[in-house]
Amino acid sequence: MSSRSIRQASVLRRSSLALALAISLGGTGVVLAQSTTGNIFGTGAQPGDTVQISGSTGITREVPVDASGRYQFNNLPVGSYQVDLKRNGAVVDSRKNVNLTVGKGSDVSFNAAASAGSAQSLDSVTVTANSLPPVDVSTVDSRTVITSEQLAKLPLARTAEAIALLAPGAVAGSGYFSGPTGNALVSIGGGSVTENAYYINGFNTTDPLSGFGGITLPYGAIDQQEVLAGGYGAAYGRSAGGVISQVGKRGTNEWHFGAQILWEPRGTRSTPGNDHYIINGDSTSAGELYNYNKKDTQMRTVESAYVGGPLIKDKLYIFLAAEQERVNQDRYTSQDAPNYYDRTYRNPKFYGKLDWNINDSNILEVTGASNKQNYDANVYGFDYSTLTRGDRVGKDTSGNPLNKSGADLYTAKFTSYITDDLTLTVLYGKMHGTYYSQVPQTQTPHIITPNNQDPLLNGGSPISNENPTTRVFDPQHKSTNTNFRIDLSYHIGDHTITAGMDNQDVRDTNDGQGTSGPGYAWEYQKHDPNTPIAGAPGGSTYVAAPGGAGFYVDRYVYDARASVRVKQRAQYIEDSWQVNDRWLVKVGLRNDQFTNYNGVSQPYLRLTSPQWAPRLGATWDVNGDSSLKIYANAGRYYLAMPASVALRSAGQSLYTREYFNYTGIDANGIPTGLTPIETATGGPISSNREYGLPRDPKTAASTSLKSEYQDEFILGFDKTLGDKWVYGAKATVRKLKNAIDDVGDSDAITAALQRQGVDLATVGPIQGSYLFNPGRASDFMVPNLNGGYYTAHVTNADFGFPQLKRNYYGLEMYLEHPFDGKWYGKLDYLYSKSYGNSEGQVRSDIGQQDVSATVDWDYPQFMDYASGELSNSRKHVIKAYGSYQLADEWMLSGNVTVASGAPKSCLGLYGADESDPTGYGSYYHYCYGEPSAPGKVGHNPWTWLVDLSAEYRPTWADKKLAFNVTVFNVLNTRERLATYPQAGGIGAVDPNYRTTLYQTTPRYARFGISYDF
């Protein structure tokens, strides 16, 4: 859709493997949908013995040992456990400090060694004296788990996304996009940033409006975070990228409390370099200052505290954590809209958890969490000719970011161990979102692209005014997300069968935007004086040539607001089958149903036919001793449509431009001496026919529409290297098989009706955009003036589109040294390529956030030469991180990321003659008349990011007090991450082309002091 204002566990892990298999208790582990639990299993006991576990959270369970001497506990809350072997009621052997890792299992086998050291935690970072490098012989997915112990050591930014970037296949998303509270986003496995799912303690916290990130925990409240980058089971859905799941801390039988203060002073932060124009424009020159970054500064402070312990010992526990982040920024904006911003962010987070052990068989967990961002900024004018600050203009009411945003969530989870073989889990929760933005208190129209003003009329300097933004959000915007799920796990013989339902409902109230000021803005443009601005005479989007020197202005109007809702349902079943002592096979099937409603509660998308998503995985313990594992999996993953899609695709949207020549510009940047330019309508034009009329839900989407889905295939191995190392490799192939976007080519629909013999005089207004499946034939309902509808069957060839393509290929190799009491380290290299003509639901190169309503596929001209390397592709990525206990009181840690740059684009007018047949402007894959596929003009530079940290924990304070210093980007590299892609045309170049949009953050330091009791 047009957007020309775009800037705006199964878990039996490593065992000695004969154990991990075919035991009469099931012999296989289970990963529930929430993936918040772990397992304990083992062998070496005698038939008739029993095994009892006692957790730090008061959980006590006891199971009999089977005829083969094996036992297993499933779906245990993560934490520390003592495992006792009992014979005739007396404890004859014991293992202490068995720590569980989320989604994995711990092998606690009994033998002659009776010390706690014989407990081998599979893939846990808690390593005992006789532990071997972990090779997981039972899990078939691709996951990275980072524990609270690692988080306390590694030099990381305090966000879920910064943690996720440790996982192979995860790369930083475009700087255009951010999450609900301003956090940067990630792309996983070539997916767009909206294709990830977020969880807290099993509750889906993904942004319900557009899928941009999700709500996360305070950093100090994270017990474990897992990142699933592929191969995950049928319990997970609504994700085609990855899953970021956090498990929060809980109270134990001992009271603990602590606090931390972090400080990032201005004085330790290097200044970014200024940005300059790269090409000559009408009123700018190459080398001229474009963005005055040199004086940008920032200071950050973070205060956090926690407390946890028993309210009733062995029965009722509480854990509370709070975090307050404050950021002060000085920012100078570019010559496009020159201002100085004095910004303040206050970002509070809260987490609370109650755990009630009702009895040995039933547990109730209640979680509350809150994530907020409060933003305030004073805006001042800025004079680029003198580099001086001007008078205060007012508050920043642009809505980017929102002044108040975030969410509060409350969940309850009930777990019942009905028998030793049957476990029931029920989860219910709500998340309430707030999205408040101040509305500019001005009736002056905003000025868009003042750099395109006629320099003969503005004195050679762009003229704008105090209105800071084109669009404003509804200040009453709120949302409610309700999640209800049931999971049932049953062990029978060599099978563990898990089934469940996963329901989610979203209500999005007062969503959308309108134009600021008087309800319209002025957008200055330049075009070839003798070529139509848009379309051709007789076409529905025709706008005549501007004449003169090619300068013109359009009156921009946008209004798309509504209250909408989404209903999502899913059912799944999965079987973990231990075929023999070396083979484990997992077979799953998931069925999703999605229904999206418009502003008057009418369904405009009803994707409720069975959408079967098979999941198949297998692992082979080659040598039978957990030293070499070969694994593979294949699966299909469906993606739901978020709530915001309805605003333009099914709402009463208004999006027009009215074109004029002008002879003057007043002191507020408003054009004077207006003369209308001829258009097809004789007035305002909408490229997508968005004229503010109610949208018939039957004409919002193709009647043959199918959900977006992706197929994935993974093959890999893990191998021990001696007794201290493990290495491996993994190949991943992902193919987007079906996508949803909007098409605006109503002429092609009209032509199809004519071929079908329809009398065009009886055809009602055809919508300017329909949701459809790119690359596939579609059926569209069109109003019949005599009553009812016509159905237009339009093939892909009729539209003139290529086939949809998004293919991701990745080859990962890694070497890891598990923590041995002294040091831990991991080195990972990934070669990957993401190639095709569709990034997914959004477009990173132009920053388009209209989910499934991008410029792509609107008209065939946009898809010419659109196939190339996609924006989230990074061919080479090297990651290395770890920690080293230098001395008893000193610890060092580091995190290094080296990555090749993202592909660059050059977007211009269409074809060799540089026309604009759609009226969109410079969004075609042509660069000054030459075809220009993504990546053809090269890549951005490689980035080299080195972060180092040192901690001093003195023995004189009983190691409860710690002092820390972290330096980010030690090398102070300043590389471009993204550049402005729109080139304009030969006769009307865009002066911003190739200017820097985003660059790596310069070097800065963080100082910290913490106390833990």
Write out the residue ranges for each language-model feature.
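Periplasm-facing N-terminal accessory domains of Gram-negative outer-membrane beta-barrel systems
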Residues: 29-130
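Periplasmic N-terminal accessory/gating domains of Gram-negative outer-membrane beta-barrel systems
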Residues: 89-91, 96-113, 126-250, 288-291, ...
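Solvent-exposed loop/turn elements at secondary-structure boundaries
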Residues: 173, 599, 606-613, 617-799, ...
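Repeated loop/turn-to-beta-strand initiation elements of outer-membrane beta-barrel proteins
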Residues: 315-318, 361-364, 421-424, 494-497, ...
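C-terminal beta-signal and adjacent terminal beta-strands/loops
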Residues: 724, 737-738, 833-835, 889-923, ...
